[in-house]
């Protein structure tokens, strides 16, 4: 607790509280007793440094943005959150003769990256780093012999230019297209090919999709630039085998290289191999909200509702799922953490208290009553 009369936004960073309690076990309920009458600001922290001051880089914080009056018998609920770090880029590192890695902290969205050599702008492509566990992007640059690149990174108020020294390495990234989907295509999914280098052109007239009886299947394709993925959508049939063939020249990459003849085989299962889940949600406070199905901590399925209180997950893999709902206050289709100085709470997450068992060839309907 802090004295409300002298409390400012910077107090939690600089001063220790007037009153403090903590626990070393798993208890989530705290009490403070023998307090002086008055008006207080209440803050909760997961204090990694143990100094009773808030360090947003490592600590979690929860707060109520209005003062409380002591004495009181009221119970106050505070939700802890870890703030997203402000955007900051690391110095790029060379990984091959035509690629740099750029590490960063914070949110990469709306970041602009440009490259130059001397006073000449150098064309580049930005791609997602292959590993989920690393906040980095790939910077692809032309196959030219230069000794350095000036990499400029801007994101809102952040702006910095790095001088990346380049060496003549043995390896250079080249066009390589792999089957990201694997051998089984789920009915909910599209077939996806992933390229090692950025794609600049796709000629659908040189791509053929066939079923097992060699019948040609109509499809549409789109390229997701940041992911370096080609997504194929088509009407799928049960228990069917498919072959997608890329004739020479169907794909051209950033380095003006075209593919050789490529062929990928995959199949679908029967609809009875999957389950369906309908969730009826009561006492919704606001729209939009996100509904996610998780296995352990991994989100497997996700949908957003802007007005409906019943959501459907059709043809999902049989297993036990955790259901959670997120109130998507800023409508960005993902959970957003809080910001202490901006007085923004983290978006509220509500978990269904039990695992939901979805079995093959089952239709499960579950009511979810929110508090």
Kindly label every feature range from the protein language model:
Residues 1-371:
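N-terminal targeting or signal-anchor segments and their processing/structural boundaries
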